[in-house]
Curated annotation (Swiss-Prot):
Regions crossing the membrane: 9-29, 136-156
Gene Ontology terms: cellular component: plasma membrane
The organism's taxonomic lineage, starting at the top: Bacteria, Bacillati, Bacillota, Bacilli, Lactobacillales
EC number of the protein: 2.7.13.3
Protein name per Swiss-Prot or TrEMBL: Sensor protein DltS
InterPro entries (UniProt xref): 2-comp_sensor_kinase (IPR050351), HATPase_C_sf (IPR036890), His_kinase_dom (IPR005467), HisK_dim/P_dom (IPR003661), HisK_dim/P_sf (IPR036097)
GO molecular function annotation: ATP binding; phosphoprotein phosphatase activity; phosphorelay sensor kinase activity
């Protein structure tokens, strides 16, 4: 978890940095391009005015004259272009007019005489391209710089994420220790109350205490399960499983429970859908989702359970009629101890069940999501099928 958080920090930092650098590079490049063109135009204007290529250096300039018959004569050519290209380009430039100063890769200046003859100075900006070796060197240094910054960001991320990691580790340890410490007194309370029930049968207060101690025991067990799931180094027993058979076994148990609640449980299960996972945890996912669907579906409604294989994944879907929940409720269904604050769901509370299901699914490299279609609440679980896993995916 924290390793992924550090990677996200580095990715975000480098993304922002790259965007800023590219923006500055684009602005700088446009600024330099403008002044390069300005300097080039100043030079060609001077050459055309003096009718003489007396500019020091190796500027790629061609000087041509055009008579009143549109005959082109090349006075000098210090570019990489052939004379034929210069002649044709000169006539094209003349058509552009004196007011223009750029055409394609050419910067030019035209001087017109009274006898309708012209002198044109042309500079080829393409010859100003940075040499290949220099461009390659710039690219190498840029890549090296970004790699260095990425390494520094990764190193610094340890100091940024470290305090959060320490605090969350302490919190998990506290939950685990507190849950273990509570198990014994809760069990003692329940045992004593059961003895009292035998001595004082039919006492509703004692019945209520027994009910609440059972609920506390379930809650403590859920907290311990979450603590174990959060600990990635805990041992797991992954093996090849027939998910179709597991679904049928769990459904058989819950059909009677659904009947007692006056609800119908319909299933569509594709045969021989194989996955790799821990059997007890996969069953726990099914139990949590079915229990959630039965408890939160509308009275006398039908719950749909389906399992199929598609896109190299086992797709498990449970849907049930429900109230229309707000986006806030749907976005927080998998949060621990989430209590809905919704007009249609004043008493809606999912406890730890869906949080545990999400943790198990993610441990199996899968994905779980909740969404609504009209009046149907759907929970969908996607797990990699057998054959798609690699040894490195099994922690």
């Amino acid at each position: 978890m924290f390793s992924d958080l550090r990677k996200k920090f580095v990715f975000l930092t480098m993304s922002i940095l790259i965007v800023v650098v590219l923006f500055l590079f684009a602005v700088s490049n446009r600024y330099n391009q403008y002044w390069d063109e300005y300097d080039a135009y100043r030079i060609v204007k001077l050459v055309a005015k003096n009718d003489y290529l007396g500019i020091p250096g190796d500027e790629p300039i061609a000087l041509v004259t055009i008579d009143n018959q549109k005959m082109v004569k090349i006075q000098s050519n210090n570019t990489d272009l052939t004379n034929d290209v210069i002649e044709k380009s000169s006539l094209k430039l003349l058509e552009q007019g004196k007011k223009s100063r750029k055409w394609k890769s050419f910067i030019y200046s035209i001087k017109e005489y009274k006898d309708k003859t012209y002198t044109i100075a042309i500079m080829d900006l393409a010859s100003y391209e940075v040499p290949y070796a220099r461009r390659f060197l710039i690219l190498v240094f840029t890549i090296f710089g970004f790699c260095l910054l990425a390494a520094v960001s990764l190193y610094l991320s340890r100091f940024i994420v470290g305090p959060v990691e320490t605090e969350m580790t302490r919190e998990k340890q506290f939950v685990s220790d507190a849950s273990h410490e509570l198990k014994t007194p809760i069990a003692a309370i329940r045992a004593n109350v059961q003895v009292l029930e035998q001595q004082i049968p039919g006492n509703r207060y004692l019945d209520h205490v027994v009910s609440e101690t059972k609920r506390m025991e379930f809650l403590i067990e859920d907290l311990l399960n979450l603590s174990r799931l959060d600990e990635k180094r805990s041992k797991v027993n992954f093996k090849k499983l027939n998910l179709s058979v597991l679904c049928q076994e769990v459904l058989l148990t819950y059909e009677s429970l659904a009947y007692e609640e006056e609800k119908c449980l319909n299933d569509t299960i594709e045969d021989d859908v194989w996955i790799v996972g821990e059997e007890s945890q996969i069953k726990q996912i099914l139990i949590i989702l079915l229990d959630n669907a039965i408890r939160h579906s509308l009275s006398k409604s039908a719950i749909q359970f389906s399992l199929k294989q598609a896109r190299r994944k086992a797709i498990l879907t449970i849907s049930n009629p429900s109230a229309i929940y707000s986006k806030e409720v749907m976005d927080n269904l998998f949060e621990r101890f989430y209590q809905a604050k919704d007009d249609h769901a004043d008493s809606l509370s999912f406890g730890l069940g869906l949080s545990i299901a999400k943790a198990i699914v993610e441990r199996h490299k899968g994905r779980i999501r909740a969404y609504q279609e009209k009046d149907q609440l759907r929970l969908e679980v996607q797990l990699p099928i057998d054959g798609f896993w690699t040894n490195t995916m099994i922690n």
